[in-house]
Regions:
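Terminal, regulation- and interaction-focused segments at domain boundaries
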Residues: 1-33
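Compact, glycine-rich, soluble single-domain proteins
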Residues: 37-83
Length: 131
């Protein structure tokens, strides 16, 4: 079993900086009519507290039209929705796009097969932003 399969996180390398990757993601979400609920700048908040960390930003996004049927069928998934994508820079300067694996969420919350498509687009979003 791969590390990704064990922890449910998919990591995709980005060809861009954290800020450029975040901007690409915001543009993709906007073009698809997906709502960006919040953008958390972890590294910016760390700096305000006098601490240093590599650039790290979390996008929280979703579509009530897509997510609500999933939550009705599997209420515990509400702890993992809205969907999240983490864009972060590792100690070597490489930028990554990380998200929960839809398959992991399916298994974790027993999401019916016919509804997993409602949240599976997260991987395509991350892949599009990485290139």
């Amino acid at each position: 079993m791969s590390d990704q399969a064990k922890n449910g996180i998919v990591d995709i390398p980005s060809n861009h900086s954290v800020d450029a990757t975040v901007e690409k993601l915001k543009g993709i979400l906007n073009s698809k009519g997906v709502m960006l609920f919040a953008l958390v700048d972890h590294s910016g908040e760390a700096a305000k507290a006098g601490l240093k960390m590599p650039p790290t930003k979390l996008l929280i996004f979703g579509s009530p039209k897509a997510g609500t049927p999933v939550m009705l069928a599997a209420p515990s998934i509400a702890i993992d929705l809205p969907l999240k994508i983490l864009v972060w820079q590792d100690a070597n300067g490489k930028v990554w796009i990380s998200s929960n694996s839809p398959q992991y969420l399916k298994e974790r919350h027993n999401v019916p097969d016919d509804l997993i498509k409602n949240i599976a687009a997260v991987e395509a979003l991350a892949t599009a932003a990485a290139s």
